[in-house]
């Protein structure tokens, strides 16, 4: 198999052996997240019921947890799956959507953080608030620039011993010591609902492919998303046509193009 040292190599490896990713995500995101994984070459499974979430985690190669549409029953499933995934030594990704908005969400995320996610992905406002700072987030939308969250991300990564990804106009990834920025994407991406949620699932797919290099896997997922976004924007008239063009661009993206066009710089 090709060495997994570049985003393109990881994309190739994922397509050669498609990982099964358990995606506990919100109602809004399920369809697009599943289609994003299929377009990229992975296999999605939207399994969240508490009665089976832990058992299914034993089958899946990675888990992603998104708290966009919460209920007590869903939290039970999230915790069960996270415990089983951790016990099996597999990676899992936490997407703390608008965790600062209500006490219910804050409590849910505190419980999930205690279960030690291997990767945390959020927007700038979510990461700032997760690190105890004052964010300007409004509902699920970020009002803070990514660069303002970089210090919070480094602190959170060290505290949680996890990879932290802050996504926005320019993405930022850190493990507390190393850090990079990924440039690319399109201004149309925030105009398509749940596209960020689907990115969390893609991070899980790359993490399943390269569990020995979770930092590199996270960077590769974000770079893949960014280049697909750039390609999709070329012929898009607006967010509607961008959405389906994005799936086509992701499906068509090859390793050589990804490695040639990915803009990743040390931070």
From Swiss-Prot:
Residues bound to substrate: 46, 194
Residues that bind ATP: 121, 167
Pfam families given in the database record: HK
CDD domains registered for this protein in UniProt: THZ_kinase (cd01170)
Top enzyme category: transferase
GO biological process, one term: thiamine diphosphate biosynthetic process
Gene3D superfamilies assigned to the protein according to its UniProt record, in alphabetical order: 3.40.1190.20
EC number: 2.7.1.50
GO molecular function: ATP binding; hydroxyethylthiazole kinase activity; magnesium ion binding
Catalysed reaction, written as an equation: 5-(2-hydroxyethyl)-4-methylthiazole + ATP = 4-methyl-5-(2-phosphooxyethyl)-thiazole + ADP + H(+)
Pathway entry: Cofactor biosynthesis; thiamine diphosphate biosynthesis; 4-methyl-5-(2-phosphoethyl)-thiazole from 5-(2-hydroxyethyl)-4-methylthiazole: step 1/1
Membrane-spanning ranges: none
Function of the molecule: Catalyzes the phosphorylation of the hydroxyl group of 4-methyl-5-beta-hydroxyethylthiazole (THZ).
Family per similarity comment: Belongs to the Thz kinase family.
Xref: NCBIfam families: PRK09355.1 (NF006830), thiM (TIGR00694)
Protein name: Hydroxyethylthiazole kinase
Organism annotation: Rhizobium leguminosarum bv. trifolii (strain WSM2304)
Gene name in the database record: thiM
